[in-house]
Regions:
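Short beta-strand and beta-hairpin "edge-sheet" elements
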Residues: 124-149
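Core residues of folded domains in eukaryotic genome-function proteins
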Residues: 100-102, 120-122, 132-134, 158-160
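Short alpha-helix capping/helix-loop boundary micro-motifs
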Residues: 100-116
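Short beta-strand/loop turn elements enriched in aromatics
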Residues: 59-105
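Short coil-to-beta transition motif at edge beta-strands of beta-rich domains
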Residues: 42, 112-129
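Active-site-proximal polar cores
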Residues: 1-77
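Short, solvent-exposed secondary-structure boundary/capping segments
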Residues: 87-88, 103, 142-165
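Intrinsically disordered, low-complexity terminal/linker regions enriched in Pro/Ser/Gly
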Residues: 171-175
Length: 175
């Protein structure tokens, strides 16, 4: 068998009552709800790894040396966790409060149609009000989505769950 060739194997599970046409219909219904009814938009700032300057020794990147692909708007179903009152040190004198973590679901088909992907370290922007865009950094890109929660009736993966944590202002403030 040629190792450079990929064989496609048809999905035949559930074939008595569910097939690829039904799967496509379910995707269309779900996308209509997420992209039409909910209409929650995030902006993906995807890092262009090839054009980003890295340190020769440690392969670290300074924020000013990061290069990005053009921003892409994505329609998602998102949730932002409640913020927490935290301290910088054990004494509790220096306190701060920031937004909570963000988790969102996105249809994989939308990413393919837009010719983009979400990966670890990318930044996500979200308008929290009319004047403020807040940024999060991707900590789980959700690329493995074959579990029951992310499939439609266990047939095939449909949605990805992406987890993000608040980006520090020194790390990213938009482009």
């Amino acid at each position: 068998m040629d190792s450079g060739r990929q064989n496609k194997v048809p999905i035949t599970r559930l074939s008595k009552f569910f097939d690829d046409e039904d799967f496509g219909l379910e995707i269309d219904f779900g996308r209509e709800y997420v992209e039409g009814d909910l209409n929650m938009t995030v902006v993906l700032y995807s890092i262009n790894i090839e054009k980003t300057d890295t340190d020769d020794v440690y392969k670290e990147v300074k924020s000013q040396d990061m290069r990005f692909f053009p921003p892409v708007e994505l329609k998602v179903n998102l949730e932002i966790d409640a913020s927490e009152n935290s301290t910088y040190g054990p004494g509790g004198r220096l306190r701060y409060r920031d937004y909570g973590d963000m988790t969102f679901n996105i249809y994989d088909k939308q990413l393919k149609e837009k010719g983009t992907d979400i990966k670890y370290g990318d930044f996500i922007g979200y308008m929290v009000d009319e004047d403020t865009m807040k940024f999060w950094v991707v900590v789980d890109d959700g690329k493995i989505f074959s579990d029951n929660e992310h499939t439609i009736f266990g047939y095939k993966g449909a949605t990805r769950t992406v987890k993000c944590t608040v980006a520090d202002k020194n790390e990213f403030e938009g482009i």
